[in-house]
């Protein structure tokens, strides 16, 4: 276990929230720009930055709750703002340095930091994390725990390997 989550849960949550983030990005871009495009770094339907962002919040929450702290909605929102923004900053910088490309640019937004992050989206991430924790996660937990890890585990490994191969095609 890592931060209160099994490897099985970590893989499932990463895949589910990476896909959910990709879907959110595609819908947001379709509404904002009027056309549907794949907004992900990879060719497939995932945005790993969302998976890492959600997992970082779950890890922090589990660590705090394991120490006996009760987290209220304000604390969950704050964790979402800070951790998701940190993940977005690191991911944006790494993608820029490694591939000399930007998958997002907040330079035109007020209170941005080098275009990688901005206050507006940091607050949106806080609300999104609050929704994930309070609304979606119980559904995700129920449906992922209903399957035997040994059977579905191989599916998860296959999907993660496909993501690895997808990464190789982008690089």
List PLM regions with ranges.
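Aromatic-rich, lipid-facing transmembrane alpha helices and their immediate juxtamembrane interface loops
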Residues: 1-171
